[in-house]
């Protein structure tokens, strides 16, 4: 073959490969619409973003986190194994700002030609094959992929990890959002997403910045959006249906998840979830661990007061224990824990026996506590002024515990309760802490006088540098100590900081000891 024809053949082959590549991608047009989804990029995406965000100025905190994730260099991402092939996941209840946050991040990136926004209808069962076909049409210039309501996909929990790996390994940044948080958390348990952020509630700082909300209002709402439409018993029922029941129902229907309530109707599931929430709040009001309360309820050994309260609730809501089996409640508790709607707290003093549960949504805690308080009045008891303080205390505990558990969700929570000491304590990753060390490090957080100060104490305690919690011998990463309740210890953080400083000194000694042991072993090997 002559050089001329050889070069001509080579050029044709290169063009063929180029055309084949373009056909494979089909140069994703600026707008694609299908049943239950649409995809936008370029000028079409810019127009959509500008229209959606017209008049919206305030940004949620997670928007800046998305930008940091998108702008992080591939080299930086790959430096840590935990972030290889990582995506950024957002989960949250309806109307909490997921879509708005995604579009705000796209606007701040100011690179519409490099961004692709794919939106699915949550109420339509999506097809991962359709999503893959869309993603296969991306070209090298499409660096940032935003997928809204991805949890509507059938078999999402089993397939999404492998699918996302295909694209993040090519250096693309993938940001996913989904309302069905149970499916999202289940995926993250087996396939580490990289960063999974729940935005259903806001921190007090964020709520104050974005809405001007004062602390009293924050304790009532927890920073949730649109709580006005969920007031009263009917509104509370609708909130539980919208935020929890639909979440569980969609996740179970679309994914191979085994549970005892798979065949229950929506109304029956609503009743079971509502009942579970009421039991949790009752356990905190009456200072009981949950299993013990369930035992007394299901064995029929109920106190007259509790029996009347439950009877009145059942009469109004159609809830009876004959229609809700204990196994259903236990399954719901497990799923609510996976969804981060509740957090389990074990009793350190009793070798983890006697678990308590805390609802992490202050709005739910408040509404259910007030509902129960009103039914107490219906049983003939007089209204007590301390009931308001008690409800606020439960809400404060919910705020402090849920925010701590959210930021350190991979840790284990404990409380401490013996026969003499009346405390509610939250400790994370705390198996080997001696009780004398524990008692020397209590921090008082009490709502009686200054709720905002108490809350800030809890927040500051949460933000202590994890370096102080390192333990080389036992492999413990972090220690967080929060104390809720009366104590004769000095109020404030003094005792905790003293404890942490002494603990740090032990760490230094331990590290020195390990260095000496390592040196001895090396010397022995040389000999």
What do the PLM-derived regions correspond to, one by one?
Residues 246-423, 427-429:
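Accessory nucleic acid-recognition modules appended to NTPase machines
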Residues 178-179, 184-295:
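Interdomain motor-coupling "hinge/lid" segment immediately C-terminal to the ATP-binding subdomain
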């Amino acid at each position: 073959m002559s050089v001329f024809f050889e070069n001509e053949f080579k050029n044709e082959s290169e063009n063929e490969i180029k055309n084949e590549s373009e056909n494979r991608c089909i140069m994703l047009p600026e707008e694609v619409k299908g049943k239950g989804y649409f995809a936008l990029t370029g000028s079409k995406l810019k127009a959509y973003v500008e229209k959606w965000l017209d008049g919206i100025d305030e940004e949620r905190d997670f928007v800046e986190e998305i930008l940091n994730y998108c702008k992080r260099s591939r080299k930086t991402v790959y430096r840590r194994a935990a972030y290889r092939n990582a995506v950024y996941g957002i989960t949250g209840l309806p109307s909490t700002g997921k879509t708005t946050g995604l579009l705000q991040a796209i606007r701040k990136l100011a690179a519409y030609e490099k961004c692709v926004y794919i939106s699915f209808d949550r109420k339509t069962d999506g097809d991962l094959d359709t999503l893959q076909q869309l993603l296969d049409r991306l070209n090298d210039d499409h660096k940032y992929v935003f997928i809204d309501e991805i949890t509507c996909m059938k078999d999402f929990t089993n397939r999404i990890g492998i699918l996302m790996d295909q694209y993040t390994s090519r250096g693309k940044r993938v940001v996913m959002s989904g309302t069905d948080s149970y499916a999202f958390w289940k995926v993250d348990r087996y396939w580490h997403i990289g960063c999974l952020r729940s935005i259903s509630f806001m921190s007090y700082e964020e709520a104050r910045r974005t809405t001007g909300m004062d602390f009293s209002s924050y304790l009532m709402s927890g920073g949730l959006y649109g709580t006005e439409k969920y007031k009263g018993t009917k509104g509370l029922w609708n909130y539980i249906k919208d935020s929890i029941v639909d979440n569980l129902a969609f996740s179970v229907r679309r994914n191979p998840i085994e549970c005892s309530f798979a065949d229950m109707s929506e109304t029956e599931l609503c009743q079971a979830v509502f009942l579970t929430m009421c039991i949790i709040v009752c356990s905190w009001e009456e200072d009981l661990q949950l299993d013990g309360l369930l035992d007394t309820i299901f064995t029929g050994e109920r106190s007259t007061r509790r029996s009347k309260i439950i009877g009145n609730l059942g009469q109004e809501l159609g809830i009876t224990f004959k229609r809700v089996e204990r196994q259903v409640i236990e399954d719901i508790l497990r799923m609510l824990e996976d969804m981060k709607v509740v957090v389990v707290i074990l009793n350190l003093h009793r070798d983890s026996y006697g678990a308590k549960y805390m609802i992490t949504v202050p709005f739910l805690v408040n509404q259910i506590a007030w509902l129960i308080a009103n039914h107490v009045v219906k049983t003939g008891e007089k209204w007590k002024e301390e009931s308001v303080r008690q409800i606020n205390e439960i809400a404060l505990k919910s705020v402090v515990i849920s925010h701590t558990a959210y930021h350190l969700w991979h840790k284990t929570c404990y409380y401490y309760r013996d026969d003499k000491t009346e405390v509610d304590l939250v400790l994370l990753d705390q198996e080997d802490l001696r009780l004398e060390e524990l008692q020397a490090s209590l921090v008082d957080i009490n709502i009686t006088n200054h709720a905002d100060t108490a809350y800030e104490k809890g927040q500051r305690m949460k933000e202590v540098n994890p370096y102080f919690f390192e333990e080389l011998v036992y492999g413990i990463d972090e220690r967080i100590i929060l104390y809720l309740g009366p104590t004769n210890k000095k109020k404030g953080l003094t005792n905790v900081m003293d404890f942490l400083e002494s603990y740090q000194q032990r760490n230094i000694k331990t590290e020195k000891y390990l260095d000496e042991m390592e040196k001895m072993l090396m010397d022995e090997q040389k000999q």
